[in-house]
A protein has these predicted regions:
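Positively charged n-region of N-terminal signal peptides that target proteins for export
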Residues: 1-4
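C-terminal motif of bacterial Sec signal peptides marking the signal peptidase cleavage site
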Residues: 12-14
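Bacterial signal peptide processing site
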Residues: 16-18
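Post-signal peptide N-terminal segment of mature Sec-exported envelope proteins
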Residues: 22-40
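Short beta-strand elements that form the blades of beta-propeller/WD-repeat-like
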Residues: 36-49, 128-135
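Mature extracytoplasmic domains of secretory-pathway proteins
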Residues: 52-54, 59-126
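Short, solvent-exposed mixed-charge patches
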Residues: 164-166
Length: 166
């Protein structure tokens, strides 16, 4: 009987509502990633019990809601200031840097590991002047995705340190 009472208490404790996440922020912006005049939507959010342990998510959807690009990582990798300025940070992060693949560095200027593509594919994408979206992937690094209209998908193009972007 004593064990039954303990089991009942444990079961009740397991059913107790859990505390909601304390680092939940979101920002949304429109972007013209897939083509000029497109109504693509960038949504960024954080999810976690606190901002030190939160995950940051970057998602791009076409106007019809079709998901075309995502990136996620630890929030502290992007922003280490804590919860006070997280919403303001997300507002800035949602402002995608939109350009074209012709502005990407030439193959010979890439460091090993900056792209997962082979040389022929990288140079073909660069020469085709496709839409390109870049956003932060850490406090000092950004990731760039290209849009392939023939396939209707976005793909990882390359990553670069911020000091090499300007």
């Amino acid at each position: 009987m004593k064990y039954a009472a303990i089991l009942v208490l444990l079961a009740l404790a397991a059913c107790a509502p859990r505390q909601a996440a304390q680092c939940e922020y979101m920002a949304t912006r429109n972007a013209e990633f897939t083509r000029p005049g497109a109504h693509d939507v960038v949504t960024v959010r954080t999810i976690g019990p606190n901002c030190e342990e939160a995950i940051a998510l970057y998602a791009v959807r076409e106007a019809d809601g079709h998901l075309i690009w995502t990136w996620s990582g630890p929030l502290r990798q992007l922003y280490a200031e804590g919860g006070e300025g997280a919403q303001a940070f997300l507002q800035q992060w949602a402002l995608a840097n939109l350009t074209t693949t012709s502005t990407a560095p030439e193959w010979r200027r890439l460091a090993p590991g900056q792209t997962t593509l082979d040389r022929l594919t990288y140079e073909d994408i660069r020469a085709r002047n496709l839409p390109m979206l870049c956003h932060l992937s850490s406090a000092a690094r950004e990731v760039c995705a290209f849009w392939e209209p023939a396939a209707g998908v976005a793909g990882l193009y390359f990553e670069r340190n911020l000091e090499t972007t300007r």
